Amino acid sequence: MRSFVGYEKGINFGGWFSQCEHTKKHYDEFIGESDFAAVSSWGIDHVRIPIDYDLIENGNGDIQESGMMYIQQCIDWCKKYRLNMILDLHKTCGFSFDEGESESGFFESEELQERFFRLWEEIAKRFGKYHDCVAFELLNEVTNKEYCDIWNEIADKCIFRIRTIAPETYILIGCLLYTSDAADEARSV
């Protein structure tokens, strides 16, 4: 198996920008620069930063600069402490794996899929230049086998659109069923 150099010993900073109370106070206090320094001192080589779409876009799909600034701050701290980063879109408009939310139209709606593509294009425009230390994870844990084929189609289209902007950035695609042993249900894209 090929090594994913720089992404072999990591930690997940969950609960900061995803599955959380989406307030400035929470974003500013839950995790900070000292946490990045600490994990670097432990020999960790990367952090995974899950984000919900509502950190970086409003209900109409317009970009929220304040959320993009938090991502930039994470990248700056990663660079300062010699860490790589996986930017994980944990939830997108129309889809969440969270209990009680689940799928709400993303896999059926071309409009929501287009919104997802535009969001990733914006992320690629802003952060693709950090391909030496930032990888993109398209969507966290697609959980239902019935979405396998459509998820592969969506991922293909999204990768193509990201690649036109950020051709060197690593892109991660999780398998179905909470990224478990369901690799036989997904194909390589």
Where are these regions (language model features)?
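Active-site mouth of glycoside hydrolases
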Residues: 2-170, 175
